[in-house]
């Protein structure tokens, strides 16, 4: 890994001295809406502090709400055609994981559930089955997890890819108990079809000696959990049908899985034989192409844009910023953990074969230190969830904001309105609801905005 010297010091100053641009009073709900330029539909929200999944229309009205679900540990909720919901349920604090993945119909009737992954001890000492699911899951027929004109989501009888935890010792990684990341693919009946455990493949992940040393030291061991969340994989998607595979590049086989490791600043594709067949990061100084992309830090929601959408076949990533990565000791990372830092976020679209940076969105005031997502829409716009602040917005390829929404419900000890992810779906996917009227929202000029 290249020693960045002065650049690292600049990063430290930017991160530690950057002003916090968070006003105490601001409007919530839909604050900008241009119906003619937006891709109109319902938006599915996975709020962290609300034990429910919400669906809103373009004007921010709640049109559907499923209660008793746990977005804070299990991650994204998704709605499939017919008003079918799949979401996590049940928490296991202090572990960031859910007890089960549940599929419900529009009225809340359970159609499918998965929990038989591992047996765990509850706080009361009893033993129960748990999915140990965290951060992500995918249905085989909806590889990127969201709508495309060429997608045909299968509601029942299909397999599911689930990102889970498993605790294990692996001396090649560290000399403490790992909270390891394990991918499982299960049938509709809950049978294990395929699995992959991250720590078995540490030698394939591109870590330099300094990074391996920092990981081995395990300074981020979580005493409350009794384990070391060394990679913190936060997304796992099927690659899905794509032009690269059509042209003969087997790395992009549709049933391969693309993963994102927040802690390592690493993205990789896992082949069905378990081997890493493609990798981006962790060190973005390794080549001219990577230096052009620039270091990705603390990223979320890495996936291949599905066929049928503008940019199909390219990689789309919410690059959070904050700090992440393992490497050499520095003022910001005396133990080599969190070696890279940046105080702004960006969304990047990358050609995964040439590593060309195709498109990006950023702004000096755009920053979500964790969670968050980006979805490519059929009209070429991108729906961005800056999750830490509960903000969702739709931007054109030129960066114009044509829809913006601030989640209005606050909860938890920190009075947070954070939203893990948001997804835009067609109106027709929830036929039980009458299509709403779309009303433009033109915000006042900031200089004219006053609280009475």
Question: What is each PLM-predicted segment?
Answer:
Residues 1-2:
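N-terminal secretory signal peptides that target proteins for export/translocation
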């Amino acid at each position: 890994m290249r020693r960045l010297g002065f650049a690292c010091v600049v990063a430290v100053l930017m991160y530690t001295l950057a002003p916090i641009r968070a006003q105490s009073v601001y409007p919530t709900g839909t604050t900008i809406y241009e119906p003619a330029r937006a891709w109109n539909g319902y938006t599915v929200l996975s709020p962290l502090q609300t034990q429910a999944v919400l669906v809103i229309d373009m004007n921010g009205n709640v049109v559907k709400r499923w209660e008793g679900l746990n977005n804070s540990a299990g991650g994204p909720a998704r709605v499939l055609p017919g008003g079918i919901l799949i979401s996590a349920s049940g928490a296991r604090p202090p572990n960031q994981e859910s007890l089960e993945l549940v599929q419900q119909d529009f009225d809340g009737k359970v159609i499918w559930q998965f929990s038989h992954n591992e047996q765990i001890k509850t706080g009361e000492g009893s033993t129960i089955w748990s999915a140990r699911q965290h951060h992500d899951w995918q249905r085989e027929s909806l590889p990127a997890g969201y709508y495309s004109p060429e997608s045909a989501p299968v509601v029942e009888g299909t397999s599911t890819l689930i990102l889970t935890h498993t605790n294990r010792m692996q001396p090649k990684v560290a000399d403490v108990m790992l909270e390891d990341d394990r991918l499982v693919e299960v049938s509709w009946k809950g049978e294990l079809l395929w699995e992959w455990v991250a720590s078995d493949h540490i030698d394939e992940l591109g870590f330099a000696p300094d990074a391996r040393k920092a990981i081995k030291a395990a300074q981020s061991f979580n005493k409350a959990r009794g384990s070391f969340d060394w990679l913190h994989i936060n997304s796992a998607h099927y690659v899905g049908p794509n032009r690269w595979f059509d042209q003969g590049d087997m790395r992009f086989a549709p049933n391969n899985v693309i993963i994102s490791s927040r802690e390592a600043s690493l993205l990789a594709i896992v082949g069905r034989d378990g081997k890493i067949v493609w990798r981006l990061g962790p060190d973005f100084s390794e080549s001219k192409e990577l230096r052009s992309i620039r270091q990705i830090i603390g990223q979320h929601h890495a996936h291949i844009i599905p066929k049928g959408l503008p940019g199909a076949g390219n990689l789309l990533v919410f690059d959070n910023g904050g700090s992440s990565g393992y490497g050499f000791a520095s003022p910001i990372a005396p133990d080599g953990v969190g070696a890279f830092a940046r105080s702004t976020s960006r969304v990047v679209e990358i050609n995964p074969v040439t590593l060309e940076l195709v498109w990006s969105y950023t702004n000096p005031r755009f920053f979500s230190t964790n969670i968050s997502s980006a979805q490519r829409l059929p009209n070429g716009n991108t729906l961005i969830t800056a999750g830490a602040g509960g903000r969702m917005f739709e931007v054109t390829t030129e960066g114009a904001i044509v829809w913006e929404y601030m989640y209005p419900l606050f909860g938890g000890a920190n009075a947070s309105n954070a939203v893990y992810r948001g997804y835009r779906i067609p109106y027709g996917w929830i036929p039980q609801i009458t299509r709403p009227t779309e009303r433009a929202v033109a915000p006042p000029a900031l200089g004219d905005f006053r609280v009475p």
